[in-house]
């Protein structure tokens, strides 16, 4: 189960990875970092916005509670990113900032711990996967082929965003955290739409939390490709706001998945409305500033 979640998260987040790495290579910090944080916020916007569309089903009331551990890891990584942006530390090892190193370590250790917990709870599932070798091989081949296409398109998206910022005078933070983030997060939104249409709230929440974890890792992976210091040291102060909002929306997601009942339609929709309004507010803030 955990392996599938990771694979799906990586697959849907490949555009963010290629965009941020490409932006790091060409020296555009705000697109590299803004794309990661902007994608996290847009993912929440997609999840809760689509929940409003499917509100009659009240899908969040039927979700499993095993997303809590993933949510805690997301909160911890968010705290690390906020600390990295606030401190602006210049300490690095081979062009890799201390914040990036901590993120990678926490991400890997966190996934190992979550995987071990899920193995204890779902040990019986192993029996169902013994004869699926051929299917897995075909899936991996398709995954690699699609990955190549995404790698090329993601790089083109980053270069286009950088050129747009230079030619129009628009803020690179706006382009990276809003425009590029929206474009690179389309696979996540489509995955959530499909899951909610099938009434599979667990897949939808798992996809978003898994993708958001990977989006934070994406920033850390992009760090060594930037050669003029560390991404965390050079990032725009506006990105701190995005990091804080992402932290708060993660808390809302964790609280919502714990609910079993809602008093009425409005109380059910209230968290989703809060997230949607918060995202719109962030967009307006970045545009005006």
Give a label for each model feature:
Residues 1-289:
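Hydrophobic alpha-helical segments, chiefly the membrane-spanning helices
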